[in-house]
């Protein structure tokens, strides 16, 4: 029997940004990340780099002008066109005459000064209906929380996790100017190594750590690949394991699948003096923490995010880590005071 691929149904009720202000969306944006149900995206992801989007007043009151720059085959191309306004503020139509299709674009989330998330619906005879999400930033780099918000939006509309990518930043391109294509090794080194270590020509792009704990003091590294895989890294300053998006290849050893694995590998005894933090999320996980006032390990409810190193997964682990004395040790301590 032949199994047919599921047919994507495009959502009809895409909600635009509340109280959308058209004039505030004008100006320059950097294309930071993309996700799509279109099958070509994964095939061409290695050729994609960050471009720009310029929005402004159109030739008529019914239009807004659109100018896009991106690299194609080493040359910076410029594409100009117009979005057609609709009766819904924040929803636009874009006609692609080459393919004779009209796309619907929606501004679904934006704070105007920092980021904007667009969703675009398209129907083509070749690929059928497709849905594409794009994350734009006023600057090429955005906060990790905004990348996570974009990922959740994309997943929420049915875009597969392996079809969500960040765009490599190779600097802003100059229209018409041809640039040399970097080698794979130079791309990898630029993504992984600190600036002062580049160009040494010695060693491998990523250090070979024999012990995972040796990596705990490194900063996190996304690596040169374009995936958006949620991982944890140990932040020595906050003494907590925090999330970042891993590209899927290379990077370094400060990269953990779970918060538990990260904490059990990297935290130090100083974690025992940290406050007990439930975090802002609304999960319900019973964990152990060391209460420095009482001098003992206690149960607490962890919400599931933004905790710190003072959280343990068993009473035994907490006592062993924070040096909680047994009865004989307590007697010895009392007699020595």
UniProtKB/Swiss-Prot annotation:
Q: Which SUPFAM superfamilies match?
A: BPTI-like, Lipocalins
CDD domains (alphabetical): Kunitz_bikunin_1-like (cd22596), Kunitz_bikunin_2-like (cd22597), lipocalin_A1M-like (cd19418)
Q: Which residues form the signal peptide?
A: 1-4
Post-translation: what modifications?
The precursor is proteolytically processed into separately functioning proteins.
Gene Ontology cellular component annotations, sorted alphabetically: cell surface; cytosol; endoplasmic reticulum; extracellular region; mitochondrial inner membrane; nuclear membrane; plasma membrane
The alphabetical list of record keywords is: Cell membrane, Chromophore, Cleavage on pair of basic residues, Cytoplasm, Disulfide bond, Endoplasmic reticulum, Extracellular matrix, Glycoprotein, Membrane, Mitochondrion, Mitochondrion inner membrane, Nucleus, Oxidoreductase, Protease inhibitor, Proteoglycan, Repeat, Secreted, Serine protease inhibitor, Signal
Tissue specificity, in the record's words, reads: Expressed by the liver and secreted in plasma.
Family of the protein in this entry = In the N-terminal section; belongs to the calycin superfamily. Lipocalin family.
Official protein name in the record? Protein AMBP
Query: Which species does the entry assign this protein to?
Result: Sus scrofa
């Amino acid at each position: 029997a032949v199994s047919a691929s599921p047919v994507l149904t495009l959502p009809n009720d895409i909600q635009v940004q509340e109280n959308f202000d058209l004039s505030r969306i004008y100006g320059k944006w950097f294309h930071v990340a993309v996700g799509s149900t279109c099958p070509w995206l994964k095939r061409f992801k290695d050729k994609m780099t960050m471009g720009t989007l310029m929005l402004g007043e159109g030739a008529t009151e019914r239009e807004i002008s659109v100018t896009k720059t991106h690299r194609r085959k080493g040359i910076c191309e410029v594409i100009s066109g117009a979005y057609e306004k609709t009766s819904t503020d924040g929803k636009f139509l874009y006609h692609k005459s080459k393919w004779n299709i009209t796309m619907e674009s929606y501004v679904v989330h934006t704070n105007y000064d920092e980021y904007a998330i667009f969703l675009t619906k398209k129907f083509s005879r070749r690929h059928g209906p497709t849905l594409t999400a794009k994350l734009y930033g006023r600057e090429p780099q955005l906060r990790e929380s905004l990348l996570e918000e974009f990922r959740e939006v994309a997943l929420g509309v049915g875009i597969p996790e392996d079809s969500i990518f960040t765009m490599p930043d190779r600097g802003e391109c100059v229209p018409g100017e041809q640039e040399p294509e970097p080698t794979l090794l130079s791309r990898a080194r630029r993504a992984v190594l600190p600036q002062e270590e580049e160009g040494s020509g010695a060693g491998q792009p990523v250090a070979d750590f024999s012990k995972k704990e040796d990596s705990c003091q490194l900063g996190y590294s996304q690596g040169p690949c374009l995936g958006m895989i949620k991982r944890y890294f140990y932040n020595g300053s906050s003494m907590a394991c925090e999330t970042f998006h891993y590209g899927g290849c290379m990077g370094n050893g400060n990269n953990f699948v779970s918060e538990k694995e990260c904490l059990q590998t990297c935290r130090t005894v100083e974690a025992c003096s940290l406050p007990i933090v439930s975090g802002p999320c609304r999960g319900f996980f019973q964990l152990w923490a060391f209460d420095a006032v009482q001098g003992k390990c206690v149960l607490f409810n962890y919400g599931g995010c933004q905790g710190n190193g003072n959280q343990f997964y068993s009473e035994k682990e907490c006592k062993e880590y924070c040096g909680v004395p047994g009865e004989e040790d307590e007697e010895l301590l009392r007699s020595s005071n």
